[in-house]
Amino acid sequence: MEPTSEYTETYDYYDTGYNDSGCDYSEWEPSYSLIPVLYMLIFILGLSGNGVVIFTVWRAKSKRRAADVYIGNLALADLTFVITLPLWAVYTALGYHWPFGVALCKISSYVVLVNMYASVFCLTCLSFDRYLAIVHSLSSGRLRSRATMLASLGAIWFLSCLLAVPTLLFRTTVDDTGSNRTTCAMDFSLVTLNQDHESLWIAGLSLSSSALGFLLPFLAMTVCYCFIGCTVTRHFSHLRKEDQKKRRLLKIITTLVVVFAFCWTPFHVLKSMDALSYLDLAPNSCGFLHFLLLAHPYATCLAYVNSCLNPFLYAFFDLRFRSQCLCLLNLKKAMHGHMSSMSSTLSAQTQKSEVQSLATKV
């Protein structure tokens, strides 16, 4: 099965296109206008929201919990990713023409995949931290130490960067002389020129990224929450104040996981179905492949929405985060008022000086 020249897949990071079976893979025209607008909206909300989260976590050093550190790193991953969205917005608006060169094609694609891995790994560590704090509250002191937390953060970023390396190797710009455009796509000519082998590479990398970046971590999170649910239910009748705080934090993290699953599941399902079609393990009809082509940009957009939702979830569920944000806003107002006061004082002093100078001259 060889990729069609009509359309080069831009959303699936381990895919070069849909199978060439003589079908018409024409894109839905409104997507060229709608998708860039959605990307820029996610960019604006994600940049401001995650910036506030990072600053809030950094500022509250004395009250920082282990969960806050993971949340801060989750926001950092999302912030790094949303910075690339203007490039993808322009790319889509130009009809999938990439004008930014090979380096930005590789780097921006790499950042997208690093974000996917780092986000799900941070959520997995958050879930495991809650599992230890609630199910093994008396015996998990060493596992929840600062050194262990820093080691897990190092492992998260190392694994995320490592697992995304195939994008750096294979993602490049491809000139399409037929449509007079340059696409940012996967090119496996470094490892094979055989179309069947290329299909295996596409399917293998696509399925492995979905397994490692979604399915296995989500299963681990599900197991953690099953144990947590049993423990919380068992001790529901006599919760101490400290336990109530744990429950509030648990509610926030559970919401983050559920929203993450809601946003990313359609993307991984469509990506896996496309990968299986390369292996002839899924329908290979024109209608099915055309459905994947039309649905994939919007499934991708839904996945990207997750990067701007988390700050609003913190603000809605976490009273402490809300109060810290209000303190931040009050600090800004105070600084603005102080600057205005200084400006007024300087202006008055300047006017007084000018009057004195004029009186001297007269």
UniProtKB/Swiss-Prot annotation:
Tissue and organ expression note: First expressed before epiboly in dorsal precursors. During epiboly, expressed in the enveloping layer, yolk syncytial layer and migrating mesendoderm. During segmentation stages, expressed in epithelial structures such as adaxial cells, border cells of the newly formed somites, developing lens, otic vesicles and venous vasculature.
Organism: Danio rerio (Zebrafish)
Signal peptide feature range: none
Knockout consequences: Morpholino knockdown of the protein induces embryonic lethality due to cardiac dysplasia with little to no blood circulation around 6 days post-fertilization (dpf). Mutant embryos show pericardial edema and accumulation of erythrocytes in the intermediate cell mass (ICM) at 30 hours post-fertilization (hpf). Display decreased angioblast migration to the embryonic midline during late gastrulation.
Protein name as it appears in the record: Apelin receptor A
Gene: aplnra
GO biological process per UniProt: angioblast cell migration from lateral mesoderm to midline; blood vessel development; cardiac muscle tissue development; cell migration; cell migration involved in gastrulation; coronary vasculature development; determination of heart left/right asymmetry; determination of left/right symmetry
Cytoplasmic compartment segments: 56-73, 128-149, 233-248, 306-362
Family statement: Belongs to the G-protein coupled receptor 1 family.
Function: G protein-coupled receptor for peptide hormones apelin (apln) and apelin receptor early endogenous ligand (apela), that plays a role in the regulation of normal cardiovascular function and fluid homeostasis. When acting as apelin receptor, activates both G(i) protein pathway that inhibits adenylate cyclase activity, and the beta-arrestin pathway that promotes internalization of the receptor. Also functions as mechanoreceptor that is activated by pathological stimuli in a G-protein-independent fashion to induce beta-arrestin signaling, hence eliciting cardiac hypertrophy.
